[in-house]
Regions:
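Class I SAM-dependent methyltransferase SAM/SAH-binding core
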Residues: 37-39, 43-93
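Helix-to-beta-strand junctions that scaffold the AdoMet/dcAdoMet cofactor pocket
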Residues: 112-113, 126-128
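Conserved class I S-adenosyl-L-methionine
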Residues: 1-34, 45-49, 68-71
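Conserved catalytic/acceptor-binding region of the Class I
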Residues: 116, 131-201
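A short acidic, Gly/Pro-enriched loop at the edge of an enzyme's catalytic core
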Residues: 92-103
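A short SAM/SAH-binding and catalytic strip from SAM-dependent methyltransferases
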Residues: 102-115
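Core SAM-dependent methyltransferase catalytic element
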Residues: 208, 255-263
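C-terminal helical/coil "lid" or tail adjacent to the Rossmann-like core of SAM-dependent
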Residues: 188-245
Length: 263
């Protein structure tokens, strides 16, 4: 069952994702005439940034959330962004034959548990010599925060809502990802886990981040209990990992960064 994303909430609480995506984009040697695919485009702001770098090219953003696609289309209309388009699509079922010079994906693919069909579709969609640049949650991502959540869902007050809960994210190691790239016919150029420091200015910002992205957990709960669950998680995390001297809260994130080429 697809998650019910709230684009405006995500837009306000995804500054870290935007910064990390722009860091990766800055490493790509974009000529300006490429045809680009952005997998998991979300609210569209990163896709629009890419479009601004393509005066003679174009970019297609796809997402499996119809809410996100509608939001992106309304925020970045074709009348103002003629080289930018958005489409509802599932990353596990790509049928875009050799259309793209470049495929990117940021803070999205960890929502997919089996990446093998995704990589097969990416290979199919790239032109020969085309490249993939992706960054998403990797093995150990937000581990300290997950520890708090996992303890909480075992509490007697919350356990009945999670009795059959399975870990919903695909956080993988570099080794297994290199193997999958090879199986899909893609040549790995760089695959590595990198550490990032996600900084939230205060408790409310941390709570908003959880509200916008921890949907597999929150959607298990009645709506009237979600704020309480978020509050208990945030307070538990801050108790174990106090804010710094400026009151900012830090969450250690692990991202898997992937660069590959279609031979």
């Amino acid at each position: 069952m697809p998650h019910k994303w709230v684009p405006k909430v995500y837009d306000k609480s995804s500054s870290a994702q935007k910064i990390w995506a722009e860091e990766v984009i800055s490493k790509i040697k974009i000529k300006g005439d490429e045809r680009v695919l952005d997998i998991g485009c979300g609210d569209g702001k990163i896709t629009a940034h890419i479009a601004s770098l393509l005066p003679q090219g174009s970019v297609l953003g796809i997402d499996s959330s119809a809410e996100m696609v509608r939001f992106a289309q309304s925020r970045f209309p074709f009348s103002s962004w003629p080289n930018l388009s958005f489409r509802y699509a599932d990353a596990r079922d790509l049928h875009l034959s050799e259309e793209f010079d470049l495929i990117v994906s940021f803070a999205a693919l960890h929502w997919v548990l089996d990446h093998r069909p995704v990589l097969v579709g990416i290979k199919r969609s790239l032109k020969p010599g085309g490249r993939l640049f992706a960054q998403f949650g990797g093995r150990g991502n937000a581990g300290e925060f997950f520890n708090i959540v996992e303890k909480l869902i075992q509490d007697e007050a919350w356990a009945p809502y999670f009795w059959d809960f399975a870990f919903p994210y695909g956080f993988f190691s570099a080794e297994e990802y290199r193997e999958w790239l090879g199986q899909a016919g893609l040549k790995a150029e760089r695959v590595e886990l990198i550490e990032k420091d996600m900084v939230q200015p205060d408790r409310q910002s941390l709570a908003s981040w959880m509200e916008s992205t921890w949907l597999p957990y929150l959607e298990r709960l009645p709506k009237e209990l979600r704020s309480r669950f978020i509050c208990q998680t945030v307070e538990g995390y801050i108790s174990a990992h106090p804010p710094d001297g400026d009151g900012r809260i830090h969450v250690r994130m692990i991202r898997l960064e992937v660069v590959a080429e279609k031979p």
